Amino acid sequence: MPSRTEREKMLAGEAYNCLDADLELERQKVKRLLRLYNLAEAAAERQTILRQMLGRVGRESIIEPPFYCVYGQHIHLGDHVYLNVLCTILDCNQVRTGHHATIGP
């Protein structure tokens, strides 16, 4: 049986090495995108970055900056989702919202 990657173990909810080089590269990539996202003033620019960063961004979904996550690609937002300021999602596994969800203060 071939051995699984640390990412596969992580997504299966098993013990994994968080210091794995591939996982570190993924985290560094999302950190760069988060920096751009949190500094962007135009909503259209933020939407473009979100679509690069997250697994799915539903129609008319908004995340108010600043926003933080670990990997980004494991986050799937339904349609008409609103995440308020300072939202942090630790997406070491899949995180999915339904439609019309609101998260935050």
Language-model segment annotations:
Residues L33-L34, M53-L54, Q73-L77, V81:
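Short amphipathic alpha-helical patches
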Residues E60-C69, I75, D79-I89, V95, ...:
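A structural motif detector for beta-strand N-caps
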